[in-house]
């Protein structure tokens, strides 16, 4: 599992897809604070590309950019907050949230962690590497992920889901690598900053894995949760 946790079951994944636009709107709104021009705002460019791949309506996308950049005259106070702790069976995780009310969110996250353990800042982040994470699919069977990683400037790569490859980069290189991958025969599906576990937990029984999955799914259902990065092997 490792790195970014994703809903595995088809029904749950279908339900989760309904939340994608809401999460992307928050990301776009935050990114647009630094300017509405994707040519000069790398973070905004990455999120806009993700929104387009998710088939976000143009009107929704443009409104989020205008809202974040202040063009609509609205005051948007979204805050990005990160929580660290453990799922059941001492599985470390980092939870990234975007919220307009930090006090409400932290209270609700504490409740969501009742079957795990919410830790202080730094309690588990030392056991993760902060990296750029680019998910890309090969344009042809001949596409070589190792060669693509070298040529594009990625630090490493690993198999992703459904035939895709996860390219790992230095945080500062994320934008440059995702721009270079298409020239190496890969279509970028998503690109973001995230956390890669150094020592993922392994050897859990099926019953223990089910407990961890249920815990993570409960967290993922929270409206303010944007991403979860889990130190779990497999």
Swiss-Prot record:
Tell me which Pfam families the record gives: TACO1_YebC_N, Transcrip_reg
Localization (cell): Cytoplasm
Keywords linked to the UniProt accession: Cytoplasm, DNA-binding, Transcription, Transcription regulation
Q: Which GO terms describe its biological process?
A: regulation of DNA-templated transcription
Gene Ontology cellular-component terms for this entry are: cytoplasm
Q: What is its main location?
A: cytoplasm
Q: InterPro entries this protein is in?
A: Integrase-like_N, TACO1_YebC-like_2nd/3rd_dom, TACO1_YebC_N, Transcrip_reg_TACO1-like, Transcrip_reg_TACO1-like_dom3, YebC-like
Family indicated by similarity: Belongs to the TACO1 family.
Protein name, per record: Probable transcriptional regulatory protein PFL_3960
The protein's organism comes out as Pseudomonas fluorescens (strain ATCC BAA-477 / NRRL B-23932 / Pf-5)
């Amino acid at each position: 599992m490792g790195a970014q946790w994703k809903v595995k079951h088809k029904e749950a994944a279908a339900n989760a897809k309904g939340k994608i636009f809401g999460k992307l709107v928050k990301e776009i709104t935050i990114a647009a604070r630094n300017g509405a021009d994707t040519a000069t705002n790398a973070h905004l460019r990455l999120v806009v590309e993700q929104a387009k791949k998710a088939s976000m309506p143009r009107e929704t996308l443009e409104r989020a950019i205008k809202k974040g950049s202040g063009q609509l005259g609205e005051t948007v106070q979204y805050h990005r907050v990160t929580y660290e702790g453990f799922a059941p069976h001492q599985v470390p995780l980092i939870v990234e949230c975007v919220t307009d009310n930090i006090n409400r969110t932290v209270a609700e996250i504490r409740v969501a962690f009742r079957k795990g353990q919410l830790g202080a800042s730094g309690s588990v982040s030392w056991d993760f590497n902060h990296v750029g994470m680019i998910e890309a699919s090969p344009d042809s069977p001949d596409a070589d992920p190792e060669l693509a990683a070298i040529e594009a400037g990625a630090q490493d790569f690993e198999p992703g889901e459904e035939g895709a490859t996860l390219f790992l980069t230095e945080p500062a290189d994320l934008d440059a690598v995702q721009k270079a991958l298409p020239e190496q025969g890969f279509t970028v599906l998503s690109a973001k900053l995230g956390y890669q576990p150094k020592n993922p937990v392994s050897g859990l029984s099926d019953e223990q894995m089910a407990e961890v999955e249920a815990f993570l799914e409960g967290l993922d259902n929270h409206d303010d949760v944007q991403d979860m990065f889990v130190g779990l092997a497999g």
